[in-house]
From Swiss-Prot:
GO terms for cellular component: cytosol. Keywords: Cytoplasm, GTP-binding, Initiation factor, Nucleotide-binding, Protein biosynthesis. GTP binds at residues 380-387, 426-430, 480-483. Residues 480-483 are annotated as: G4. Belongs to the TRAFAC class translation factor GTPase superfamily. Classic translation factor GTPase family. IF-2 subfamily. Residues 70-81, 94-109, 144-159, 168-183 have a biased composition (Basic and acidic residues). Residues 516-518 are annotated as: G5. Residues 254-279 have a biased composition (Basic residues). InterPro entries: EF-G-like_DII, IF2_II, IF2_N, P-loop_NTPase, Small_GTP-bd, T_Tr_GTP-bd_dom, TF_IF2_bacterial-like, TIF_IF2. This is Translation initiation factor IF-2. Residues 426-429 are annotated as: G3. It is found in: Cytoplasm. The gene is infB. The lineage of its organism: Bacteria, Bacillati, Bacillota, Bacilli, Lactobacillales. Gene3D superfamilies: 1.10.10.2480, P-loop containing nucleotide triphosphate hydrolases (3.40.50.300), Translation factors (2.40.30.10), Translation initiation factor IF- 2, domain 3 (3.40.50.10050). It comes from Lactobacillus helveticus (strain DPC 4571).
Length: 870
C-alpha cells in the first residue's frame, strides 16, 4: 500500500504543514512532524476533514472581505489629509513595538511585520475553530479589518525599512503569487502592516499584503515635525534598535524561504532510477574443460560464482569458487541449469604435420584463392643435363661450378616467362640422393623427367618415375642432348613406354618434348607445355592465411647461424613472423630469394632462404606459422623434447631374447665415423649411403653427424671414440686442424659423394691402398681483387703459411665451406711470372675457369703426393 508524507498532503490541500500535523494528531494519527508517513485511508480521512471545515465559499468570503478592506483603506487615506493623529495612538504604537520585539522570527515572517497579539490570537482561534459557524468567521473578519485600519493610521517605526524590502519583493512575480496563495488560506486574517502607495490602483486580484506602504501624507509631515524621521536608517535613538531588529528578521526570513524553496525543489526532483543488471541468457551448450572451477563455469554460462556454489550446495556438493570440479559434477550442474554439457577436445598443437594438413585442406576450400605459379621439379639420371637445362632457363652457369659436374643438393629457382612465373626445383640424380628426389616429388606440381637421347633410360630415371607416380604428379618428358650425333629419341620413347609413359602421338597423355639444353633447342616449347599443364590443373592458393611450407635444404652458416631454404605453399610469410620448422622454432629474421636479393615477404610457390631459427632443421620438415612467438616457442620446445625422448627409446638394452644378436654384433668390427657436410640433405644422403655398405664382419657406425665446418669438438669426439672424420664440401678450422695433427685424428675431405662411399667401402674390406695423399703446402688470404677483361679476376693475396706453387692445385674456402676446387692459372709477384711464392710475401694469381673471388676468401694450396702403402 502506497504511503504519503504530511508535507505532500499539506501541499495538496493548500494548508501549512503545522496545521496538517495538528489536525492529524487530533484525528488520532501517529505522526510526529511533516515528514511522517500515513496510508491512503488516513490521507482520505485527513483531506475530508479539511474539506468539511473549510469550504470554498468561506475562502471566497474572506477574500471579498479583504478586498473591501482595501477599498475602505483607500477611502480612509483620501480623507486622512485633514485629520491629525492622536497622541494616544503614539502610545499604542510603542506597545506594538514591544510586542513585535518579543515575537519570534517565524511569526514575524507570517504576519509580514504585524505586531498585534490580538490578530495572532484571532488567527490561532481561527485555526482551532475551523468548524465554527459562518457568522463567527465574519465577526473575526470585522475585527481583523478594525485592527488593519489602526495599523495603517499608526505605523511602526521600522516599517520604512520593510517598505523598501517589500518594494523590491514586488518586482518578483513568482514570490507575489506565493503571498497571494497565503492570503487565500486561513492566514489572511492577520492584519498586514504594509501601507498602500499613494495613487497606486488597488485590484481585487492582489491581496492587501502585496501592496507596498506609501509615504506619509503631506499633512502628516507638517504635523509639528513629529514622526518625520521615524524608521529611517539615519535615525538615532530607540528606533535604531528596531531598525536593526527588523533587518535581522528580514534576513532570517529570506534565509528560511530560500531553504524551504530548495527543499521543495529537492522533493520535486525525480529520484534516480536504479538500473537493474540484465541477466544474460544461458547458452545452449556448456563446453567445459577438465579441472574447471565455479568461476570458470560462471563466465561461460553468464552466472555469478556464488550462485553456482549455492546451486552445487543444493545438489549436495560442498565446494568453493576456486576448487576444481570433476567431469560428473560439471555435467550435473549443466543438467540442473537445463543446458547440454560437452567436454572440449584439446588439439595437440605440437603435431605440426597434422596442423599442416588441416591448413592445406582449409585453404583449398577457401573463397580467397588466387592463381599461383606452378612448382616444377626437374628429375632424371645423373649427368643427363638437368642443371644445364636450368642454367639455360635462368641464363646462369651453375653446372660449371659443381663438384664432379653433378648436383648434390636441391636448388630452388624462379623463372619468368612473359608475365608469368615458374618455380623450378633441381634435384640430384645420383643414387645416394633418393630421399631428395622423393621430397622433390612430394612438394611439386609437375615433374619434368630429363632423359639423355644418347644414353636412354637409367636406374635413377626409373626411380624418378616411381617417385612421381607415388606422389600422383603429372610427368613431362624432356629428351635432352638432341644436338649430339648419337641421339636416338625414338629409342628413348620406346623404353619409357614400358613404364606406362605413352606420348600423345601414340594415344597417351604424356607430353614429350625433344630439346637441347646446350643450344636452347625447343626450350621455349617446353616452357609453353609446362604452363599449359599448369592451366589445366588450375593451381590456386590463399595468400591471406598464415604461411605453411616445406624445407628444401638446411645448413649452418658462419655469421648467420642456421639457414633454411623453404618453399612457401600456402599463405604469406613475412619478416618477423613466428614459425616452427620441424623440431626448431624462431622468428623470421631475414629472407633472400633465389637471386640473392632481400625480400620482406614470400607468397605461395616462392622459394626463399630464411634465417632466425634456433637450430638447423631437417630436410623435408614442415614449416608452420603461429600467431605469437610464445606459442611457437612452446611448440618447438615440446617437439624437441619428444625427439629427444624418441632417440632415447631407440637405445636397445640386452635381454634374454636379443642376447645372441648382441653378442654377434659385439664380435663385429665397427668403422666409427664423424660425418660433417655443408647442407642437411647431403648429411642424410651420405649417412644412409654409408650405412647401406654391406661387408661381412664390418659395419659402419656414424657416431655424430652435422652441418658446418669441422671444429674442435668434432676432433675431440673422434679422438675419444677412435674414429675418423669425413668432411663433405667442408673444411676444418685452423684450430681443429692443428688439434687433429696433435691427437693423430684422420680427417678425410670429399666433394663427390661416390668417392667417399668407395673409400669407406675399400677401408671396410681392408683393400684400401692409398696411392696418392693430399698434402697442403700453403695458405693464402685474399686482400684485394681486380677485374681485367680477357683475363678474369686477379686475386691480390698474402701468403700466410707455407708456399704457393704455380703448378699446384688450389681450393677456395669461404666461411668454412668449399666454393671451388681447381687449378692455378697464373702466379705473379709484382709484374713477373714466378713458379712459387713463399710465406710472408704478396702475390697475384688467377684461377682457371673461376672468377667469383671476394676479399676475405681463403686459398688452400695443395699437391697430390704419392705415398707408400702401409
Amino acid at each position: 500500500m502506497a504511503k504519503k508524507r504530511i508535507y505532500e498532503v499539506a501541499k495538496e490541500v493548500g494548508v501549512d504543514n503545522k496545521v496538517v500535523v495538528q489536525k492529524a494528531k487530533e484525528l488520532g494519527f501517529d505522526v510526529k512532524n511533516h515528514m511522517s508517513s500515513i496510508d491512503d485511508a488516513q490521507v482520505a480521512k485527513l483531506k475530508g476533514s479539511f474539506q468539511n471545515s473549510a469550504p470554498a465559499e468561506k475562502n471566497n468570503k474572506i477574500k471579498i472581505s479583504v478586498s473591501s478592506i482595501r477599498k475602505n483603506e483607500k477611502k480612509q487615506e483620501d480623507n486622512a489629509g485633514s485629520k491629525k493623529p492622536r497622541r494616544r495612538n503614539n502610545k499604542r504604537l510603542q506597545n506594538n513595538d514591544r510586542n513585535h520585539k518579543n515575537r519570534n522570527d517565524r511569526d514575524h515572517s507570517a504576519n509580514s511585520g504585524s505586531g498585534k497579539p490580538k490578530a495572532a490570537a484571532l488567527l490561532q482561534q481561527f485555526k482551532q475553530k475551523q468548524r465554527a459557524e459562518e457568522g463567527q468567521l465574519n465577526r473575526q473578519a470585522q475585527k481583523a479589518k478594525k485592527e488593519y485600519h489602526e495599523q495603517l493610521k499608526y505605523p511602526k517605526k521600522e516599517q520604512p525599512v520593510n517598505n523598501k524590502k517589500k518594494t523590491n519583493k514586488e518586482s518578483n512575480n513568482k514570490k507575489s503569487e506565493e503571498v497571494e496563495k497565503k492570503v487565500i488560506g486561513p492566514k489572511i486574517l492577520k492584519p498586514s502592516p504594509a501601507r498602500l502607495k499613494k495613487n497606486q490602483p488597488s485590484t481585487n486580484e492582489k491581496p492587501a499584503v502585496k501592496v507596498s506602504i506609501p509615504e506619509p501624507p503631506k499633512e502628516e509631515k507638517r504635523n509639528n515635525g513629529r514622526g518625520k524621521n521615524m524608521g529611517k536608517p539615519g535615525h538615532k535613538g530607540k528606533n535604531q534598535f528596531f531598525n536593526n531588529h527588523s533587518e535581522q528578521s528580514d534576513r532570517s526570513e529570506r534565509k528560511r524561504r530560500k531553504n524551504k524553496n530548495k527543499k521543495r525543489k529537492q522533493e520535486q526532483k525525480p529520484k534516480k532510477q536504479i538500473t537493474k543488471r540484465k541477466e544474460r541468457p544461458l547458452p545452449e551448450t556448456l563446453v567445459y574443460e577438465k579441472g574447471m572451477n565455479a568461476q570458470d563455469i560462471g563466465k561461460l554460462i553468464h552466472r555469478e560464482p556464488a550462485e553456482i556454489v549455492k546451486k552445487l550446495f543444493m545438489l549436495g556438493v560442498m565446494t568453493n569458487q576456486n576448487r576444481s570440479l570433476d567431469k560428473d559434477t560439471i555435467e550435473l550442474l549443466a543438467a540442473e541449469y537445463g543446458i547440454n554439457a560437452k567436454q572440449k577436445v584439446h588439439e595437440d598443437i605440437s603435431d605440426i604435420d597434422t596442423l599442416y594438413n588441416k591448413r592445406m585442406e582449409a585453404s583449398k576450400k577457401s573463397k580467397n584463392q588466387v592463381k599461383r605459379p606452378p612448382v616444377v621439379t626437374i628429375m632424371g639420371h645423373v649427368d643427363h643435363g638437368k642443371t644445364t637445362l636450368l642454367d639455360r632457363l635462368r641464363h646462369t652457369h651453375v653446372s660449371a661450378h659443381e663438384a664432379g659436374g653433378i648436383t648434390q643438393k636441391i636448388g630452388a629457382y624462379q623463372v619468368r616467362l612473359d608475365d608469368r612465373l615458374i618455380t623450378f626445383l633441381d634435384t640430384p640424380g645420383h643414387a645416394a640422393f633418393s630421399n631428395m628426389r622423393a621430397r622433390g616429388a612430394e612438394i611439386t606440381d609437375i615433374v619434368v623427367l630429363v632423359v639423355a637421347a644418347d644414353d636412354g633410360v637409367m636406374p635413377q630415371t626409373v626411380e624418378a618415375i616411381d617417385h612421381a607416380k607415388s606422389a600422383n604428379v603429372p610427368i613431362i618428358v624432356a629428351i635432352n642432348k638432341m644436338d649430339k650425333p648419337g641421339a636416338n629419341p625414338q629409342h628413348v620413347t620406346e623404353e619409357l613406354m614400358k613404364y606406362n609413359l605413352i606420348p600423345e602421338d601414340y594415344g597417351g597423355d604424356t607430353i614429350f618434348v625433344n630439346i637441347s639444353a646446350r643450344t636452347g633447342q625447343n626450350v621455349d616449347d617446353l616452357l609453353q607445355m609446362i604452363l599449359l599443364q599448369a592451366d589445366m590443373m588450375e593451381l590456386k592458393a590463399n595468400p591471406t592465411e598464415m604461411a605453411i611450407g616445406t624445407v628444401i635444404e638446411a645448413r649452418l652458416s658462419r655469421g648467420r647461424g642456421p639457414v633454411a631454404d623453404v618453399l612457401i605453399q600456402q599463405g604469406t610469410l613475412n619478416i618477423g613472423d613466428p614459425i616452427v620448422v620441424g623440431d626448431t622454432f624462431g622468428r623470421v629474421r631475414t629472407m633472400t630469394n633465389d637471386r640473392g636479393r632481400q625480400v620482406k615477404k614470400a607468397t605461395p610457390s616462392e622459394p626463399v632462404e630464411i634465417t632466425g631459427l634456433n637450430d638447423v632443421p631437417e630436410s623435408a620438415d614442415k614449416l608452420v606459422e603461429f600467431k605469437d612467438e610464445k606459442t611457437a616457442r612452446s611448440v618447438g620446445e615440446a617437439r624437441a623434447q619428444q625427439a629427444l625422448q624418441k632417440s632415447r627409446e631407440n637405445v636397445q638394452h640386452v635381454t634374454l631374447d636379443n642376447l645372441f644378436d648382441t653378442m654377434k654384433k659385439e664380435n663385429m668390427k665397427e668403422v666409427d665415423i664423424v660425418l660433417k657436410a655443408d647442407v642437411q640433405g647431403s648429411v642424410e644422403a651420405l649417412q644412409q649411403s654409408l650405412e647401406k655398405i654391406e661387408v661381412e664382419g664390418v659395419r659402419v657406425n656414424i657416431i655424430h653427424s652435422g652441418v658446418g665446418a669441422i671444429n674442435e669438438s668434432d676432433v675431440t669426439l673422434a679422438g675419444a671414440s677412435n674414429a675418423f672424420i669425413i668432411g663433405f664440401n667442408v673444411r676444418p678450422t685452423a684450430t681443429a686442424k692443428s688439434q687433429a695433427e696433435t691427437e693423430g685424428v684422420d680427417i678425410r675431405l670429399y666433394s663427390i659423394i661416390y668417392k667417399a662411399i668407395d673409400d669407406v667401402t675399400a677401408a671396410m674390406k681392408g683393400m684400401l691402398e692409398p696411392t696418392y695423399e693430399e698434402k697442403v703446402i700453403g695458405n693464402l688470404t685474399v686482400r684485394e681483387t681486380w677485374k681485367v677483361s680477357k683475363v678474369g679476376t686477379i686475386a691480390g693475396s698474402f701468403v700466410d703459411k707455407g708456399l704457393v706453387k704455380s703448378d699446384a692445385k688450389i681450393r677456395i674456402i669461404r666461411d668454412g665451406i668449399v666454393k671451388y676446387d681447381g687449378e692455378i692459372a697464373s702466379l705473379k709477384r709484382f709484374k713477373d711470372d714466378v713458379k712459387e711464392v713463399k710465406q710472408g710475401n704478396d702475390c697475384g694469381l688467377t684461377i682457371k675457369d673461376y672468377n667469383d673471388i671476394k676479399v676475405g676468401d681463403e686459398f688452400e694450396v695443395y699437391e697430390m703426393q704419392q705415398v707408400e702403402p702401409k
